[in-house]
Amino acid sequence: MKIKRTQEIDQFFNRCLHNIQNESKNNFLGLVVSKETEKDIQKQMKKAGFFEFQGDSDKWPSLFISSNDYMNRPYHKTIKLEKIISDEFTYQTQMVNANELFSLSSIQFDPKRELNDSMRLVALDEPMEVTILYQHNEVWMLDVPSEAETIDPIAKKAYGNVLTFGLGIGYFPFMAMLNPNVKSITVIEKSKSVIELFNQSLKPQFPNNIPLTIIEGDAFDYWKEDVLAQYDSVFVDIWKSNDDGLDLIEKLLESYLPQYDKVDFWIESSCLEIMPTLILMYFESISRNKHAKTYDKDYQRILRKIDAYFKKNDQMIEDVNSLKDFMYDMKLHRKILSIKL
């Protein structure tokens, strides 16, 4: 692929590079907000580039979410984590302060597609007690609003025979069971201890309206075309955060690239947040007949995959929208990551 440097494309590159370097959004994490200061903070967030505050101020979303609404979600009303009895797993409760901004969802991609991607920051309207689960005295699972916010939409869109990788405290299977379009749920879980914990303490509290099957096994042993073909929708949740998510998603996709619409990866936009930036770096470099480079060895490997993909494309790109289409195509992100070098 070749890129013709035009004034429009140069200006686009400059805007993207400016957005990459703008870290002012991070300054709002943990900021204390009240009903009295909410509007002023929203104005500051607008100035920092949060795109949800760029339009008419009357339509700006509130910075507050209801603690009561979260605690009254079906899982929390039904499942009592204090019933967990295990020598290996323990739990503690901790109060989360109200009026402090935290990230609720996975990364939201810039509607203008110019790398002004951002977190959705909100605060609880009242203090809330959350559960922290430990395995061998190390934090294993946090029962916090962001977990529900990032899993509920996937449970609602699931249908037919569902396969999920990763059991945890069973939040996804529980919510998927409430979906009338789901016929059965199969879970692949590597840890025998997690399965025993679930079967002993949590499964008895679950509804039994549809079959729930738990298989002890490694995700990579079941991530195969013939296995996934037996299911209608697939959800993968085997990483702790976006820190290890990109690496695991890449390894899975190198093993097998499934149909895009059939599979959801937990917090995929956060795990793959770097992809639009790396593609932009590649485009900017080849427009100058240079090779894109980064000091991060993992990102450099992905740049090599990006190069391998676009080398097969003999297009001459002369417009910004074509570049944006490539940068923000999540189906393309998966395809690039699936390339074996």
Language-model regions, residue ranges each:
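N-terminal auxiliary segments of SAM/dcSAM-dependent transferases
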Residues: 1-125
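SAM cofactor-binding core of SAM-dependent methyltransferases
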Residues: 142-203, 217
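Conserved beta-strand segments of alpha/beta enzyme cores
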Residues: 184, 211-213, 262
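S-adenosyl-L-methionine
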Residues: 191-233, 241-242
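C-terminal substrate-binding/active-site "lid" region of AdoMet-derived donor-dependent transferases
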Residues: 240-340
